[in-house]
Each structure stands twice: as C-alpha cells, then as structure tokens.
Amino acid sequence: MSASESALLPDSLLLNGREFRYLDVQQYPANSPTDLNGYEARVLDFCRQWLNGAQEFTLHTSGSTGTPQSVTMTRQQLEASARRTGDYFDLGPGERMLVCLNCEYVGGIMMLVRAFERRMHLTIVEPQADPFALVPAEADFDFTSFVPLQLRAILAAGHAPRLNRMKAILVGGAAVEKGLERDIQQLTVPVYLTYGMTETASHIALRRLNGPNPTPTYRVLPGIEVGQDERGCLTIQADVTRNELITTNDRVNLLDAHTFEWLGRADFVINSGGVKVQAEKVEQVLEMALMELGLTTRAFVAGRADERLGEQVSAFLEGPALPAAQQQQLQALLGQRLGKYEIPRELVFVPQFSTTASGKLDRRATIQSAP
C-alpha cells in the first residue's frame, strides 16, 4: 500500500457526530468528554477492548426467543465472522461503514469488528427508527445493517437514493414482513436478510431479497457446516462456534449442504387440540391478507391458553381495533387460505408491540400485555 493510500485509512471514528481518535479510545476513559451518555460510554469501552487486543468478550442475547443469556466469545471467533462477511462483500480499507444497530448486542458489535478488521471509516449513531436523521445529508456510506423497523422508516422518509449509493445492505434481527419485502424491490442496492445468532457471532447464512435473483432460501457462507437434528432443526459447526456443534430451534428444509429454507421455530409450534400449527406459516398468510386489504399493520401469530384446545391460534395486530367490516374481510381471507385448524380463532389488538433493546419483537412481553 502506498503512502498516499495509507494516509486515507481511518485513525478515528465518529460516534453520535463526535470524532474520537483511536489513540484516545485506547486510553478510554482518560481524555474522554465528561458528557458521554451511557450508550456512548459502553460503545467506547468495547472499542477500547478491541483496539487493545482483548482476547475474550461477553456478549448478551436479546431474549427475543427465550431468557436473555451471557455468551463468552473469543477474539478469534469474532475475527473469523468478520473475515467471512468482509470477503463475501469485498469490504476494503477506506470504505465507509454506518453502524446504527445496538452495539450492546452481537449485530452492532460485529459491525464494529468488521470496520476495525477491514480498516473502514466508522460512523456510529445511537439506534433509532431513522438513523439518517442523525447524520449529515451529504454523508454517504458503502455498507450498513438495519433491523426491519429501521429500513421501513428509512424508505418511508424518502432515503432510497442514499441506500442505492451503497455496496450492500444487511437486514436482520427480526422477520421481514411481506409489505416491507415488496417495498425493498424499489432498491437497486443488494439487500440481504441474515440468519444467525449470538452463539455464531452473527450471521452464517444470507438470503437475497431483491434484484434479478431474489430467493426464498438462505445460502450458507463458505466454511460453515450445517445439518439437521431429529426434529428437523438446523445444526451449525464452524470456526465461529469453536468447531463445536450448535443445535438451534429453527426448523428448516435442508436442500443441500449449502442451502436451506427456514420453516419456523420449533418452540413457536402451537398445539391446538392435538394439531400442531407452525405460527410462522400462518403469519405469512396473515401478512398477505393485510396487504390485500391495504393495511400496514404489524402482526404475528402465537398460541393462547384455551380450556378446550389447550392452545388456540391467535393473531396479534398492532394498533387500534379494525372496524368490524374489515375484521370480517380479514377473517374471510384467512379462512380461504388456511387449513381448518390454522385459522386464528381471535384477533387481538395491542396498542404497541413490545421490543427488546436490540430492536427485535418481544413476543412474550407483547402477549402478556395484550387484553
């Protein structure tokens, strides 16, 4: 690399609009502003650890699919994940990374690691619905990652041209509903839905959502071995798992050694009168029906206790109750497209869905708060 090229490499990062030189970050909290908020302090502390060569890191799961847990990851695991993503998207020195995920969880943490490992310019903003509201209008980026809620807000705010100047965009942390997937088709920048978890140091597979060849299946990244257990749930083994076999609760259709279709979580199966109903299958039909009625309501499906059936299939919708006529139209569409035992027996309207700190839908909390 020439001297002129080296001069273009980053020696600082931007956090909420303020510049922090790496030499100062390595000495954090010395030489730091006294008015940092808690989030900024925690981000800088992780950056300090990474830049100073720490070998172990404690990561926290979001709790969206169970009780939040702490997971110890080695530097080698995080480096392997960053290297795999960097190679796949050809991320290189001097390119620009926007980090707007919560950096207290693996999605945001791995964005930081990728930027450090690939020597990319790093702009970090505190998570909010429209991250572009926090960066200058003239700022452009090459790579970023959003949760679906953010991408929905960004498109609604008219920021598609800014997205289209990027090399690629990741979307993860929650399912992408049909309405958002339709809106993504307007983008020329490649958009990928990620599959992964804290225990795999973020994603191990990607699904292209737009462009000439969108696909309903996930493609496993090079060097990752996948299989299935006796339940049909995905197993994962690779350097990011310390070569230990991890068994997930995600039911998949494994098409070959590198491709799978995600069917739903084993723990989201509703046992209604002895008939097992996969909640995510009903959700897909529900989302399509809402789209046909011109509704942008967020929704999900889960089981609720029922004296006769044990569990009944229930559809939870965000916002005020729909007019009776629309509810009848929705139920009619569901009745046409779902099996007898799959049809939601009730529509439950919740003013606002609960989310975790990492931006994921918190189903359990939402169900508990529902009327």
Predicted regions: what is each one?
Residues N249-Y341:
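AMP-binding/adenylate-forming catalytic core of the ANL superfamily
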Residues E40-H60, P93-E95:
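Conserved pre-ATP/AMP-binding loop-to-beta segment of ANL
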Residues A175, A205-L245:
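Adenylate-forming AMP-binding core of the ANL superfamily, especially NRPS adenylation
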Residues T74-A80, R96-A153:
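AMP-binding/adenylate-forming
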Residues A157-P212:
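Gly/Ser/Thr-rich phosphate-binding loop
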Residues A3, A7-L14, T85-G86, E104-R118:
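Hydrophobic alpha-helical segments in the ANL/AMP-binding
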Residues E56-R83, D90:
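Conserved AMP-binding A3 loop
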Residues S314-E318, L330-P371:
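Conserved C-terminal "lid"/linker of ANL adenylate-forming enzymes
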